[in-house]
A protein has these predicted regions:
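Short strand-edge motifs at loop-to-beta-strand transitions and within beta-strands
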Residues: 109-111
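Aromatic- and carboxylate-lined catalytic core of secreted/periplasmic carbohydrate-active enzymes
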Residues: 1-102, 120-140
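Short beta-strand edge segments in extracellular beta-sheet folds
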Residues: 105-107
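Residue-level detector of conserved, well-ordered beta-strand and adjacent loop positions
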Residues: 114
């Protein structure tokens, strides 16, 4: 469900692909891939749909999707990570923007959070949609 379509069809063109790759790039720009150490899958689950995450000493990042409906009102739980304070950043995959950044605390190796259902920006309400990406960055 990420915006990038992994299938080729006559409806796929440069305008669609370039826009979608740009959205993904805005997310990955925040992850220092070349500096990550001790990279491993993180345990992550959600009430409905699917979730996947990676952890390292520097950052935890993941993706949550519900292709049957949406991720609004979803509860995401990430486990097997280090205790402490983190900056949680929730990313809108279709618009290519971070919707929310807030400080959270990991206790007993676990953090749970929910995506915003609607985000009001100026005079517009932005629906979260069928998927989201997230980053948990340790606060030092």
């Amino acid at each position: 469900m990420t915006p990038f379509w992994w299938a080729h069809s006559r409806f796929l063109n440069d305008n669609i692909v370039n826009s979608q790759i740009t959205s993904i790039r805005r997310f990955t720009d925040r992850i220092p891939f070349s500096k990550l150490t001790d990279i491993a899958p993180a345990q992550v689950k959600c009430l409905r749909g699917d979730a996947y995450a990676m952890k390292s000493n520097e950052v935890v990042f993941g993706w949550v999707v519900n292709s049957d409906s949406d991720v609004a009102g979803e509860k995401v739980t990430v486990s097997s990570i280090k205790n402490g304070k983190y900056k949680l950043m929730i990313f809108h995959t279709w618009r290519g923007v971070f919707l929310e950044e807030k400080e959270v605390t990991v206790t007993n190796g676990t953090i749970s959070f929910g995506p915003p259902y609607m985000r009001i920006t100026g005079s517009q309400a932005n629906y979260i949609g069928q998927d989201l990406a997230f980053i948990l960055e340790p606060m030092i």
